[in-house]
């Protein structure tokens, strides 16, 4: 059995900052995540990709951001329960008890759920499934592995354009294909790629891949036109992910689709259960890493008052510490 003041469910950026902030408030904290390493989707999907919208960093690699967050929390010795899924939520004497995979229990004063979008599965590129692992990938753990290759990126969101700008200096060629004329990606991200020697093909789909054991080419068909065969070594299918809340969906939390509804204190409908980061929903919600950091601090501060009603909601600035 484990016992802490705050149990953080999810070791992505918001969860790691929640761990720091709990320590800053003098609270003991445990971080639970089903993945074997901290960092959530950043570590799992794009550790080498540059992130441009974190305050104070013009650009920072995903793995470096995660390393900095872990280092920031380290002085407070958070307990990491990685490779461990939080399966159940119950209460004992009014306090939350998390049932962990494997049968262990984590007793705590409050829970802060920072599980991102839950567990995630890449949306498949139908014509490419037989090449998974031999030329079709859904994220790029090591961009250097694609040095000198002809790379085809499929998708129109931020991930597709981020991979295009990351891989362009390394690859022999980069082609980005999107089935629509308009993109979901941020306008600045699109403009950055258009300024690079990246071929962008719109209103088009990948209709066939060529190759024996590995991909050697791809047929691209523009709407109303003929197919064009491109030489391709690697296809990056950046088509987004389907999310699954997993056991969280059975905890009795109020949901808005796959998100947890919270109030201005980041409290959910369950006693002593708060949430922060991409998993939350409220009017005007914007899903950014930067937003998640503020929500994590709000959740922890309000949880601290629940644990000790005599405590101040605002503990002071970290710069006041000597």
Swiss-Prot record:
Database matches in Pfam families: Pyr_redox_2
Highest taxon, organism lineage: Bacteria
Keyword set, alphabetical order: FAD, Flavoprotein, NADP, Oxidoreductase
Binding sites annotated in the UniProt record for FAD: 33, 41, 46, 86, 120, 278, 319
Top EC group: oxidoreductase
SUPFAM superfamilies given in the database record: FAD/NAD(P)-binding domain
Keyword NADP listed: yes
GO molecular function: ferredoxin-NADP+ reductase activity; flavin adenine dinucleotide binding; NADP binding
Catalytic activity: 2 reduced [2Fe-2S]-[ferredoxin] + NADP(+) + H(+) = 2 oxidized [2Fe-2S]-[ferredoxin] + NADPH
Cofactor binding note from Swiss-Prot or TrEMBL: Binds 1 FAD per subunit.
Requisite cofactors: FAD
Entry keyword annotation includes Ion transport: no
EC number: 1.18.1.2
Assembly information from the UniProt record: Homodimer.
Family, as annotated: Belongs to the ferredoxin--NADP reductase type 2 family.
Protein name as annotated: Ferredoxin--NADP reductase
